[in-house]
Amino acid sequence: MGNNKEITNVSKATIGRMPAYLRYLKEKEGAGEKTISSTAIAEDQRLNAVQVRKDLAVISSVAGKPKLGFEIRELIRDINRFLGYDNVTEAVLVGAGGLGSALAGYGGFKNYGLNIVAAFDKSPERIGRTINGVKIFDAKDLTHTVRRLNVLIGIIAVPGPAAQEVADELVAGGVRAIWNFAPAHLALPPDIAVKNEDMAASLAI
């Protein structure tokens, strides 16, 4: 997830806003726009323009130009570099049911620099099978396998009541960041980055 030294000096709130900025900027780039103002970004994200400028100052050395704003291509490049999206990072997926299967086949993860290398489930019917090229392992081996693979990112797609236990096992295996699609609040050490996904938005996947 980018340069560790760089990220440790940035608040989790700022890091958490970067993927949304990136999605919006890519939409604008796709529409043919070349520049954008912090005010436009703020309005789309329902934030204060001052906050947006502070966030962008963290990851970009390029200042916005009066009346022109920021160059979209440069901001996209800087955010990709900051988050490590310009490098592929391996991740594991826990939960191979309906949502998990959809996530395993979601090509958009590559836009975030993520490559799912293994999936886990407790259902005997699913263990040993593959979903979209990703092999499903027994969930009881989660911690051991994550440690063996040296994976730092975990994606949780299990029912809410099981999410905390899964998160604890991921952390025990060495995971440093969790993308949580389960409808549950996770209590984790302060040095573990957590992104709680809005399920309404997730259904769009």
What are these regions (language model features)?
Residues M1-K34:
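Extreme N-terminal segment that seeds HTH/winged-HTH DNA-binding domains in transcriptional regulators
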Residues K26-E29, V134-I205:
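Phosphate-bearing ligand-interacting subdomains
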Residues T35, G107, T145:
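Catalytic, metal-anchored helix/loop core of enzyme active sites in primary metabolism
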Residues T35, T39, E43-V88:
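HTH-adjacent hinge/linker in prokaryotic transcriptional regulators
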Residues A96-G97:
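Glycine-rich Rossmann-fold phosphate-binding loop(s) that bind the pyrophosphate
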Residues G100:
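N-terminal Rossmann-fold NAD(P) dinucleotide-binding loop
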Residues K110-N132:
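NAD(P)-binding Rossmann-fold cofactor-contacting core
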